[in-house]
Amino acid sequence: MALAYGADAVYLAGSRFGMRASAGNFDRRQMEKAIALAHGMGRRVYVTCNTLPREDELNALPAFLEELDGSADGLIIADMGVLALARRYAPNTKLHVSTQMGVINSAAACALYEMGADTVVLAREASMEDIRKIRANTPKELRLEAFVHGAMCVSFSGRCLLSNYLTGRDANRGECAQPCRWSYSLMEEKRPGEYFPIVEDGGTYIMNSRDMRMIEHIPELLEAGIDSFKIEGRMKSAYYAAIITNAYRHGIDAALRGEPLEPVWLEETEKVSHRPYCTGFYYDYPGQHYAQASYSTRADVAAVVESCDGEGNAVPVSYTHLRAHETLRHL
């Protein structure tokens, strides 16, 4: 879906070593088909190898890396040891440093470049000014990538132990339960079953993060030196991938032509389920503007379209029934 709606590349996970353990990840045969499909469209596939593996997992890495060498367009890596192993066992594949590695300065970026990295996905905590300075002090051959849309983590670039502590599911091994996005109530020890809402207007909203949206700031990101934009897509619906990818495709193309963003594409990003949007750490520290907890969406799926008639009009094959007084707007 992402490729159909304008993505230049997609990232996906194999059966192991990916940061979405509960997702329907790709086995070897599915991976081969996905890579062939993307390459047939002139697009690229980056395979995630971005968990922090434990000692007893290292023996499986060489075979995993050798299997992908020369077929995947890049490997996304979050561990220094895995980066070294990838240079040895996947010498024909470009190496991308994951945002999980927390790169936030030029010294780290240069060191990783010397270790063989082709691309560094900067930490979400990097500001616009940080990016400008990193670009000015790194080799031009090193590509810089940045997340521009998706969830914000309460910990530094996703290195969080909250999920592990509360559920036994390790966020650093692809099993995050996202407890930072749960709704919590307070129960007093001697009043079991009585739950009190937590209201703390004078305190912290760290467990209540917003979603990042940078579609309005694409020209500035390009000017700062970002070579590619990354959208959170795994564990999202096909609808989400289509809507958000399409909006950013038009936003990027407009920026490259020197044209302003059309309001319709900003409006499109409101049509998926999301938390209130913010610009992350790009311009300042988010601080206390994490005040609203609920997800929101301003649109429902009204029909599924699988074909067009001879005049290019959509032919819906299934419908969602509208309730009384609801309207459907044709775009």
Task: Kindly give the residue locations of the regions a language model identified.
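Hydrophobic faces of well-ordered beta-strands that scaffold small-molecule active sites
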Residues: V10-L12, V45-C49, L75-I77, L95-T99, ...
